[in-house]
Amino acid sequence: MELQTAARYRLLDELRGLDLISMMLYHGMWDVVFLFGVAQKWYTGRPGFVWQQSICWVFILLSGFCLPLGHHPFRRGAVVFGAGALVTAVTLLFLPEDVVWFGVLTLLGSSMLLTAALDPLLRRVPPAVGVAVSALLFWVTYPTMNGFWNLPGGRLALPQALYASYTTAYLGFMPKSFFSTDYFPLLPWLFLFWAGYFLHHLVGRGRLAPLRRSVCPPLGWTGRHSLVLYLLHQPVILGVLTVAFRLVRAG
């Protein structure tokens, strides 16, 4: 999630940091509602959904946009994918009722690895076409988990045979028995990542100079250390909330 470049684009770091803080607040509220039983209708309703979607859309689009700025995309992708596997292992061992299969880190790592592997082919696509097609395919495949795809004239029902296993769930076709508290399959989210990737090439490196300025350095620090902070934030928040709720209930 970090930009690996000597002359950093600080505004991108700060945008990532702001989005990460929003994610931390969202996850903190998730703990309050689902682990500590404090009902919040707005959070479980449409406002909470819009908040969650705004976080992941920015995070994934920005990750795709920033990928061409970094070095060693295969190594970076492997690290992020490994971090996703770590999250799965930890939740499976310690929070099996809230296990994470194919969460956002697994998605980002997979997208980085696939994009790095396909980069010679993707670079042949005109950037404007790439942005438009990626956005269209994101819209088409957005309801994959619900059993259909969007089409201009209506919906295309997908064969239920596709929704067969955890392997198909990784792609976006999750069976009814599948459960994950954080689920970001390749479909549709890879296309949002690619929209960011092509948007970077559409803008062009020469027009990114304004993004080097800084507006809020603390947000930049948060953005530069986003992977570590992401891995640590939920245990820390959960610990703080556990102590806080015990004190409140004891009093």
Regions found by a protein language model. Give the residues of each.
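Alpha-helical transmembrane segments and their immediate juxtamembrane cytosolic regions
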Residues: 1-251
